[in-house]
């Protein structure tokens, strides 16, 4: 197969600054900048699969050519890049008697930097936090090895996955002193990180109108710093839990309730604290399923506190962020034509359906 992806953004950046003495805003002409960004990705891929009795094998490879152009009014910041890369994947599965299934897999993936990671000029989030992009930032590359066991009990499923993931050129936000009382943040390829652990998942269908899924991860996390900006090579034991519930209230009404707990973790410059949050969403379909209205509330208890503690040789920065209100979104969509089979529709009804529900 072949796939083409293109993204284009052309604009400028300016900022109004608050003058406490004059009690008015004024434009900061010294931080006015223009930018142009275009990215095109040409991809070709092939997948081969075969089954021998209870053994299934699948191998694939994806070749990508990525062309990016960055233009800016900042002198010396223009960049044109071309990359050609391969991303292989291999999956081997075996089904034992009584529906016991074992699957081993390997895949190589990438995460490309977003535009604001690369914008090469100073911006401000607030009076005390300045930011600057890095036009030379590179994509992340992830090599993932997994061994999964799965057992079905009717409509219920239990699975366990052992995994090891190695990420090269990890992208992370770094913070350094900038001026009196002001820090400067920038995105950088800080080095490599490693995650080795186990994921447990239980999916239950207790009654006709309720589906519930619990996922939990426990893994050893190590980040190997290769930057000189006060970073460290350190490790931690990380964990997270997600509980998702889907309620079918009639043919056209769905309610989704989920809660997550994310444990503390180390970073190259310090650590982040644990936090938890809960979301709820209601979806109503009207006009013979052509009109869909979704009302979603994210972090309904305002518990998703972000606490980051950065400690380097020349900086100590403690950041606490707590939301004042839940985030509320209302989404309306109209389906003009639907070619999906009924079996596909039923499958979607039991999956993640609500836009804006995940953090």
Each model region followed by its residue ranges:
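Transmembrane beta-strands of outer-membrane beta-barrel pores
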Residues: 4-8, 52-54, 63-69, 106-112, ...
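Residues on the lipid-exposed face of transmembrane beta-strands in outer-membrane beta-barrel proteins
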Residues: 46-50, 90-94, 147-151, 162, ...
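Surface-exposed extracellular loop regions of Gram-negative outer-membrane beta-barrel proteins
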Residues: 39-75, 83-89, 98-144, 164-185, 209-220, 244-265, ...
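Surface-exposed loop/turn segments flanking beta-strands in extracellular/periplasmic regions
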Residues: 8-35, 79-83, 116-135, 171-189, ...
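Outer membrane beta-barrel strand-and-loop segments of large Gram-negative receptors
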Residues: 26-32, 134, 138, 153, ...
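Outer-membrane beta-barrel channels and translocator barrels
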Residues: 52-55, 95-99, 142, 152-156, ...
């Amino acid at each position: 197969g072949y796939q083409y992806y293109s993204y284009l953004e052309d604009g400028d950046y300016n900022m109004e600054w608050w003058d406490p003495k004059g009690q008015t805003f004024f434009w900061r002409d010294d931080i006015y900048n223009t930018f142009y960004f275009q990215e095109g990705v040409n991809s070709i891929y092939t997948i081969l699969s075969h089954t021998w009795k209870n053994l299934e094998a699948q191998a694939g490879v994806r070749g990508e050519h990525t062309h990016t152009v960055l233009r800016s009014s900042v002198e010396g910041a223009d960049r044109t890049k071309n990359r050609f890369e391969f991303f292989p994947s291999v999956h081997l599965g075996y089904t034992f008697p009584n529906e016991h299934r074992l699957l081993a897999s390997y895949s190589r993936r990438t995460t490309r930097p977003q535009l604001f990671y690369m914008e090469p000029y100073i911006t401000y989030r607030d009076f005390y936090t300045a930011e600057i992009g890095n036009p030379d930032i590179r994509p992340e590359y992830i090599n993932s090895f997994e061994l999964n066991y799965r057992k079905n009990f009717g409509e219920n499923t239990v699975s366990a996955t052992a995994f090891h993931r190695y990420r090269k050129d990890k992208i992370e936000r770094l913070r350094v002193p900038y001026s009196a009382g002001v820090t400067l943040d920038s995105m950088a390829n800080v080095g490599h990180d490693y995650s080795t652990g186990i994921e447990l998942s239980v999916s239950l269908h207790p009654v006709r109108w309720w589906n519930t899924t619990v996922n939990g991860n426990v893994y050893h996390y190590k980040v190997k710093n290769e930057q000189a900006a006060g970073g460290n090579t350190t490790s931690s034991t990380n964990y997270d839990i997600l509980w998702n519930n889907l309620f079918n209230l009639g043919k056209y009404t769905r309610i989704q309730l989920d809660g997550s707990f994310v444990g503390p973790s180390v970073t190259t410059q310090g650590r982040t604290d644990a936090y938890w949050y809960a979301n709820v969403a209601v979806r109503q379909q009207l006009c013979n399923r052509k009109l869909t209205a979704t009302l979603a509330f994210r972090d309904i208890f305002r518990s998703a506190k972000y606490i980051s503690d950065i400690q380097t040789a020349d900086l100590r920065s403690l950041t606490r962020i707590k939301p004042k209100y839940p985030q509320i979104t209302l989404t309306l969509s109209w389906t003009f034509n639907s070619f999906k089979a009924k079996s596909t529709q039923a499958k979607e009804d039991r999956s993640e359906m609500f836009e804006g529900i995940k953090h």
